[in-house]
Amino acid sequence: MKTMQQRLAQATLPLVVLAALFTATHSAHAQTDRLIIENGDSALTKEQAREQKEQWDATHRLRGKVNNRVEKEFDKADRAYDNQDNCEQSLNVNAYWEPNTLRCLDRRTGRPVTP
């Protein structure tokens, strides 16, 4: 009779161990519908910060380019205005201001004149 109980115990032991493992793994599953961030520092926030920095840098470079272009166009218009003023006040009677090319030209030759 003891041998029968021993055989039964030996046969059920692996089943009990498997059941215990299944129960342990089943209860070990974590609830994944919540995100916990410790100290506000995660890969997602670092990535967002990097993307925002790249966007700010690109915007800053673009603004710099636009400002340089506006300044260049202003300087060009300012020089043209000064050149027109100098050409019209020139003592050279053959000098005239060409508004299309923004240059002071000689009436006889059509070449640029330095007023």
Curated annotation (Swiss-Prot):
The keyword Aminoacyl-tRNA synthetase does not apply. Keywords: Signal. Residues 1-30 form the signal peptide. The keyword ATP-binding does not apply. It comes from the Bacteria. Belongs to the UPF0482 family. This is UPF0482 protein ETA_17520. It comes from Erwinia tasmaniensis (strain DSM 17950 / CFBP 7177 / CIP 109463 / NCPPB 4357 / Et1/99).
